[in-house]
Each structure stands twice: as C-alpha cells, then as structure tokens.
Amino acid sequence: MRTAKTLIEELRLSPHPEGGWYREVWRAPEEEGERALASAIYFLLEAHQRSHWHKVDAAEIWLWHGGDPLMLSHSVSPRGPVREVRLGPDVIAGDQPQVVIGAHEWQSAVPLPGTEGYTLVSCVVTPGFKFSGFTLAPPDWRPGA
C-alpha cells in the first residue's frame, strides 16, 4: 500500500522549509550565467501539512502525480487578489493536471481531503531554483490580509 511514509522513504525526501517533503531530481547541466536553465523536484504534502506562502524568482510548473487533489493558491501581488487552482486527476470535474505560477508570484498549497492522506507533485522551476531567490512569508500571512 502506498502511504505518505512509504513514498517519503522510497523517494528519499527531506523536509522542505515551506512545509512538506522534497528532493531535487534534476538540474539542467546547461547554465545561463551562474544559474541552471531549469530544475525539478518531487514535492509531497501529507494531509496535515501545507506549503506556506512563499515566492520564487523564477517561473514554476506544478505537475500533479498522485494522492489526493491539491488546492494551489497564488497572487501576483501581496495585496491580492488570491486565485485558486485545483490540481488533481479529474479533468472532467475541473481538476488541472498542471499549472504554471509566474516568477515572483506569491503561492501556497494545501492537500484537499481525500482517502490517500498525501499529495505528490513535481515542481519544475526555470531558470533553475536557488534558495537565494526564495522568499518565505511570515506565519499566518496571506496576500490581501
């Protein structure tokens, strides 16, 4: 049986500063200046976890792989408005299997209630992710609040 704990172990994930679990799985060898052209991670949120509000200085593509659906909230401005996109498998019901978040957009994610107890996605960042380009908002902050 696939559980969050099993996937965390099998995928060799580590705690992520924004919440959840991750592991970088790819970084493009080509570089633009001192930065890779793109990078990718596995990212897993357990049912009780969330990806806290943060922004990245690069475009980010979220790709849903398994588990429960995920609500991805995002805003181009710290003043709002906040938009929500549901990532998941049921495209007929309106789920999106992937979504692009623009560079410098505020974003947050939370698994939706379901039977699996986790959500597994990949995040592809271009140009490649650097922690120096990552900003984590204060606890309980949200755009427009």
Task: Label every PLM stretch briefly.
Residues 1-100, 106-109, 113-117, 123-145:
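Non-catalytic, conserved peripheral segments adjacent to functional cores
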